[in-house]
Amino acid sequence: MLDVKSFQLQSFLPLPYEEVLAPRLKRAHEKLQSGSGAGGEFTGWVHLPRDYDREEFARIQAAASRIRANSQALVVIGIGGSYLGARGVIDCLCSPNYNLKRKDTPNIYFVGNGLSSDAMGEVLDLVADVDFSVNVISKSGTTAEPAVAFRFFREALEKKYGREGARERIYATTDKARGALKSLADSEGWETFVVPDDVGGRYSVLTAVGLLPIAVAGVDISALMQGAAEMMEACTEASFQCPAWRYAAIRYELYRAGRSIELLACYDPAFRFMAEWWKQLYGESEGKEGKGLFPASVEFTADLHSMGQYIQEGKRLMFETVVRLGPSDRQLTVPADEADGDGLNFLAGKSLDFIRDRAMEGTLLAHTEGGVPNLIVETSGRTPADLGQLIYFFEYACGLSGYLLDVNPFDQPGVEAYKKNMFALLGKPGYEDRRAQLESKLEG
């Protein structure tokens, strides 16, 4: 089972902070469990690992099997919570080099998360001469980046297979009853999957939003959900026995002590997009009303050679949360070299994992001694069940953290500001007055 460990935090935290925070955490816990807190209408994810729709889950598995059988590539169109979780899980469980590996599952390309002609054009080129399918993910169907991307890939599908053939290769994950994408999918006869009304995008990786692409990659999504269910059960414990309580409490107390940045560190490159998912989860949930930790991430040991100097001796703004994944199935040992010109024969016969763990321990000690608090989130393995536990753990701790800050962890009103400006500057009907104001500001 996943565990949270503090690392020599005594000098950084008031003791006993657990006793002081316990009543507030209990209230936050009760709000999550009952859906009675701010944004409670979006807490469907809390019991999702137990209550998910089994019929739709079976349809997800069937669709994934069809895609694996008839496609050499799957194009996943989505932005933010509509793609980060799936990409994170696939990278973590399959490989960040997934598309380069020899395998019996399709390549998976993620688009619609930006507005780059080069990036979009490259993926269009990559799928031009192979059989491919598309999974477009959008609650409304009107979010600019994925909606624009879908136009390109729908056109490519219809040119390649005809409108009828394309119909069998488009899968829409969207609202169950309304919205532009739902209306279009129903009129065209595409298979649809549901973005639940009571689950926000950044909490949706364990719904069809994440599960369909993850299943196409060959990951056992039943085991993923089982792991999440195990952590859900652990999080029903209204005490510091719950790992999410410990994590939420430590980060809140460090925030109160003046730490404004949380640096998520992992020693495995496969975790990079899980860290990107985590950044959105915590950034959108906490960052409002002038409050919240700024979530950032680093990949060690690589970033010890770029950011390590600042972490060690720069301004004392941050603390580190180190994610330690369980043992790897693959073990490489350092070969001996008779000449020993690099002086590294003292490492001969030792595994890379052993060396990495000593690097981690040395870094924990150095950064702590340099005034940077550290805590460790540790999984017992690297299986789908382990990652399911980790996903639910971060989600539950995030909900607790938002309520500790007295903010709504389930809305994101600030995201609309750039959208309104962008639409006005692009000439969207109804934004004429705003466009004139913005153009005047840009000229000034």
What positions do the PLM features span?
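Flexible loop/turn segments at secondary-structure boundaries
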Residues: 82-85, 117-119, 142-145, 178-182, ...
